[in-house]
């Protein structure tokens, strides 16, 4: 997908959201705020043939227990297609890739909705989660045992 195609998809998405001037920045990034709480970043990933969506989960840096939960979620593919990761600043983000070949404004809007649903699920999970000191000492190979 070329930059003009990415810009066209964002423009189409903007029209469906009531933001007709939606376009990528010079750096190729588009940021959308939802509910005044979530900032979704939309960027083209040419090397992976994807449009990547990224959204922070909660505030602050991930602690060890949260990092373990994220790793387990990724291992079990429990994120509904979203991948939990640590941003360079240490905050937790969920990311979701959308295939460029299948990408349209409707597809992108559905993917954003799915990502935001996962972010909200994670935020609830992190509020409920109590620090689990023993979790850091558990053997991760337990998850890989066959029965």
Predicted regions and their residues:
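Short, internal acidic amphipathic alpha-helical interface segments
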Residues: 54-97
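Short, highly charged C-terminal tails/helix-capping segments
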Residues: 126-147
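Charge-rich, low-complexity N-terminal segments
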Residues: 1-40, 87
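A generic structural signal for beta-strand entry/edge sites
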Residues: 27-29, 48-52, 89-93
